[in-house]
Amino acid sequence: MPKRTDIQKIMVIGSGPIIIGQAAEFDYAGTQACLSLKEEGYEVVLVNSNPATIMTDKEIADKVYIEPITLEFVTRILRKERPDALLPTLGGQTGLNMAMELSKNGILDELGVEFLGTRLSAIDQAEDRDLFKQLMEELEQPIPESEIVNTVEEAIAFAATIGYPVIVRPAFTLGGTGGGMCANEKELREITENGLKLSPVTQCLIERSIAGFKEIEYEVMRDSADNALVVCNMENFDPVGIHTGDSIVFAPAQTMSDYENQMLRDASLSIIRALKIEGGCNVQLALDPNSFKYYVIEVNPRVSRSSALASKATGYPIAKLAAKIAVGLTLDEVINPVTGSTYAMFEPALDYVVAKIPRFPFDKFEKGERRLGTQMKATGEVMAIGRNIEESLLKACRSLEIGVHHNEIPELAAVSDDALIEKVVKAQDDRLFYVSEAIRRGYTPEEIAELTKIDIFYLDKLLHIFEIEQELGAHPQDLEVLKTAKLNGFSDRKIAELWGTTDDQVRQLRLENKIVPVYKMVDTCAAEFDSETPYFYSTYGWENESIRSDKESVLVLGSGPIRIGQGVEFDYATVHSVKAIQAAGYEAIIMNSNPETVSTDFSVSDKLYFEPLTFEDVMNVIDLEQPKGVIVQFGGQTAINLAEPLAKAGVTILGTQVADLDRAEDRDLFEQALKELDIPQPPGQTATNEEEAALAARKIGFPVLVRPSYVLGGRAMEIVENEEDLRSYMRTAVKASPDHPVLVDSYIVGQECEVDAISDGKNVLIPGIMEHIERAGVHSGDSMAVYPPQTLSQKVQETIADYTKRLAIGLHCLGMMNIQFVIKDEKVYVIEVNPRASRTVPFLSKVTNIPMAQVATKLILGQSLSELGYQNGLYPESTRVHIKAPVFSFTKLAKVDSLLGPEMKSTGEVMGSDATLEKALYKAFEASYLHLPTFGNVVFTIADDAKEEALNLARRFQNIGYGILATEGTAAFFASHGLQAQPVGKIGDDDKDIPSFVRKGRIQAIINTVGTKRTADEDGEQIRRSAIEHGVPLFTALDTANAMLKVLESRSFVTEAI
C-alpha cells in the first residue's frame, strides 16, 4: 500500500530528559524516525524538552519545539501547529503517557488529530494490566497467575491464595519503577505501598513469581497489510527476576532448541497481529528451562531500549522503518537500507554473536543499593560483536570502562568463599565477575547453575575462558596459545599479565607474527546478498571485509557507555564533528561501543567500527585505516585518556596537543600556566598522603574542597570544614599516591559560571557565558545554568572573556575548551579548565545558533575563525532567557542520598526558554518534573549557617499564601525573628514527623540544607528519601528554592481588602 496522501503534517513527541530506564536509545529512534518521515515528504513537528540530543537539532524536523512535555505545553503547540497526525511510539514511556493524556483530555478529538503506528486501544491493551490479561486469555497465551490490586490489603489476600514469592508491578511506570520481588508479607506490604503511590492510576499487578525461568525477548515488526516478521530474538544471561535493562543480553538467543524458538516466535507474531500494531513491538517471554512451558511477561507497543539494541545488533533500522510503516507503506515495498537491494520484508540472519552489558552508576554512588531486581538501575550499556560468545563477552567487558579489561576484578581474589557465593546468588551489578571468580576457584558450572539458574551453557563458556587463562599461564610466548586466546576475545593486557610481560611486548609479538584482527561487516543477511553498509566489528579469523579507501580519513573516538558525568551530550558533539569532517572533504570514521546512540547509527559516518575504546582496539583500527589523525576532544574523558598512549605510539592527535592537555589536567603545570598568564585561582595545594593534606588545609584555611586529579563528573569530591572530616576523607574516599595526588583547594562561596570557548590558536570565539543558579559547591552538571547571565556585571563579563582568551591562547588550545569560574566580591577566579568539549555544548549550540562542535572540528582541520565568519571574543547575547536544568533518577536508586554537592548525580537535562527569567524558570521546573502547586505547605529543616537566609525565603513563601512548617531548631530561629512556623518532628516522632506528613500528602515542598558535620545527618537523609519516594519537590540548595519562589511570585496575585 503506498504512503498516505491525506496527511501532510505529523507531530512526534520525544522522550524528554535522560533518566534511568529511558536513555539515549530514544534520541536515536526519534532522530531516525523524523528524518525518515521528512524523506517521504511530510512536514514534521517535534516536541522534546531535552537539549542534549541530536533529535532537537533544527535540521531533524521542520519545526523543533524544546518545551516541557506536559499537557499544558503540548496542547499549546498542537493548537498552534494543528498537525494532521501524532506519532507517539518513538518517545519511550514519556511519549506514550503524554499521548494517552492528550487523548483522555479530548484535545486530539477537538483538533481532529489521529494516532499513527499504534492505536490508542493497543497501547491501553499492552499497558493496562487488566486489559492485557484479557487479551492474552483470548489468544490462549499463558501468563503467570495475577491479580490487579488498588490497596495493600488486596495484595496480601491474593498472595495468600497463590503463595510466595510474588512480583509487584505498578501500572504505567517506567523501567519497573516501584516494583519488586517479595518473599514474604512484610516485603509485599512495603513494596505494594510504594508501588501504588508511584503508579499514576494507583494500581499494581501482583503476580506469581517465575524467577529462574529463561528470559527471552522478540523484537517484531508489522505493517498495515498484516505482514509481520521477527527482526531479532535475544536471550538474557540472567534468568527472569532481573529487569532486562539490567541483564547481560546475547543476540541471537543461544540456548533454545529450534522447536522452542518457533513456539515463542509464533506467540510473538500472534500478539503483534492481535494488537494490530503498525511498526515495531517488543515481546518479553519466560521459558521454563525444564519443559516447553512458557509465559508471556510483557509487551511494549513502541520502540524500546531493546529495539535500539536489536537495530544495532542486526543492522536492521527498526525506528526508520516503523516511521514509514506508520504512514501506510508496507514491508514489501520498502527497500532495506543495509543491502540497498533486498526489501525490508525479510528476517535478518546473523553470522556472529552480540553481547550487551549494562553500565551502572555505583562507581559514583558507593552507598547505593546494588542488588538487582525488577526495577532498573543501569544508566547505559555497551555492546560488542564477536564470532563466538567468549569473544563478544570479553570485548563487552573491556568496553564498560570500569577499570577492568577481562571478566575479572582482581580484588575479588581476597573475598571469602561464603561472601563470594552470597554475591553469586544475590545478584548485584557485578555478578558476572563474582560468577567468573567462583569458576576460577573450582566451583563447577553445574553447582553454579543450581544456585543461580543461569543456563549451564553460559557457565561452560566462562569455564572455557578460565581454561585458556591456565593454558596461557603454562605456555608463555607460545604462538598457538596466543592465537587461541585472541580468537576468544582476550586482550593484550590480560595476556601480558598472565605472561608477566607488558602489553606492548604482546602487541609486538602479534604484529611480528601477523596475528592481527580482520574486520567483518554487519550486513543483516549473513553475507547472503551484497551489502553496502560501512559497519564493522573485529575478530581474529580470515578475510578482512573493511577496505581502506583512497580518500584521506579522520578517526573520531566516541564516548562509550552513558554514565553519570558523561552522558549523551558527548555523543552529540561526536556526531556534529563527523558532519564537519565530511564537509571538509575527508572520510569520517567513528569508533564507539554504545548501542543506544546516534553516533553508532551506520548512516551517520562513512565508516563505523563497533569496538571497545581501549588503546589496543583503537590501534588495531588505526593500523588498518592509517587516518590523517585522531580527534579525541568530543569523546569526554574516555577519549581524552587515550590521547597520551596514542601519541606515544606515534599517532597524530588532531586539535589541542597532549602536552597542553596535560597542562590543563596536571595540577602543578596548571598552576604554573595560570601564574604566567596572571590569572587568579583559589589558593590550593596537592597532597599525596593524609599528613600532607592536613598540612595544606591548615595553611589554606577551612573550608576546603578536596578531590582526586584527573576525574570527570566530580567523582569523590567533597567540601570539608575541619581536619577530622578531612582525615576521614583521605582514609576512605581516595587512594592517594605520588602518581595520583589529591587536590586541596580553598573553597570560595561565590557565584559560579562557566564558558565554552572555541579557538583556532590565534583567535577565540566565546559563544556565551552561563551563570549557575546554585552557588559554588554544587557540581556544574547538577546546577541550573542560565544564559545569558542575569546578575553578572559588565566588568565581570569582560574579565571572564579576557581570562578565557588568555587561557585558550596560553594553553595552545585548538578546538574546544570549557572553563569554570567562581566570582566573589566582583573578583573572578578560575576553578578548572577542560581542554575538550563539555556537557554544555549542545545547550549552548542551540541557544546561540552556533554549531560549536562543527566549528571546532573545522578549526582542528586547519580553517580559521575569520574564514568561517566568526569574530574574536564574546558573541552577541540572545534576547530570550534560556535555562538548562538537571534531572535526577533518585526514584530508581534506593540508598542514594539526593543531597547536592560537588559530586555529580544528575542523569539528564531539560531546557526552558522564554522572554523573562521567571517564565524560563517555570518551563525548566515543569520540564524536569518539579511541579509546585500555587498553595500548600512548605517545610524548612535548615543548618545553622543558612537559617538567616532561609528566614527570608520562608517570609516570601508565607506572603504568597503558603503555610510554613519547620523542624524544632529552625522553627525556634524563625519565631525569634517574628515568623511563626508550625513545628514538626524530624524523625521517629510517629505520626508527627516529616515522613509521615509527607505520606499523608500534607507537605508540598521540602527545603533541607546540611551543615558542615555531614556525619550527623542520618535524619536528613531519611527526610530526603521520603520526599523522593513520594514525589514531593525537594530543594537541598537555597538558591534553587529561591528560583522556584521567583516563579511562584510571578504567578501569584495579591488579594487584599480595601
UniProtKB/Swiss-Prot annotation:
Residues 930-1058 form the MGS-like domain. Mn(2+) 1 binds at Q284, E298. Large subunit of the glutamine-dependent carbamoyl phosphate synthetase (CPSase). CPSase catalyzes the formation of carbamoyl phosphate from the ammonia moiety of glutamine, carbonate, and phosphate donated by ATP, constituting the first step of 2 biosynthetic pathways, one leading to arginine and/or urea and the other to pyrimidine nucleotides. This is Carbamoyl phosphate synthase large chain. Mg(2+) 4 binds at E832, N834. Residues 1-401 are annotated as: Carboxyphosphate synthetic domain. Belongs to the CarB family. Mn(2+) 3 binds at Q820, E832. CDD domains: MGS_CPS_II. ATP 1 binds at R129, R169, G175, G176, R208, I210, E215, G241, I242, H243, Q284, E298. GO terms for biological process: 'de novo' UMP biosynthetic process; glutamine metabolic process; L-arginine biosynthetic process. Mg(2+) 2 binds at E298, N300. Mg(2+) 1 binds at Q284, E298. GO terms for molecular function: ATP binding; carbamoyl-phosphate synthase (ammonia) activity; carbamoyl-phosphate synthase (glutamine-hydrolyzing) activity; metal ion binding. GO terms for cellular component: cytoplasm. Composed of two chains; the small (or glutamine) chain promotes the hydrolysis of glutamine to ammonia, which is used by the large (or ammonia) chain to synthesize carbamoyl phosphate. Tetramer of heterodimers (alpha,beta)4. It is an enzyme of class 6 (ligase). Binds 4 Mg(2+) or Mn(2+) ions per subunit. The keyword Nucleotidyltransferase does not apply. Mn(2+) 4 binds at E832, N834. It holds the Pfam family CPSase_L_D2. It catalyses: hydrogencarbonate + L-glutamine + 2 ATP + H2O = carbamoyl phosphate + L-glutamate + 2 ADP + phosphate + 2 H(+). Disulfide bonds: none annotated. Its EC number is 6.3.4.16, 6.3.5.5.
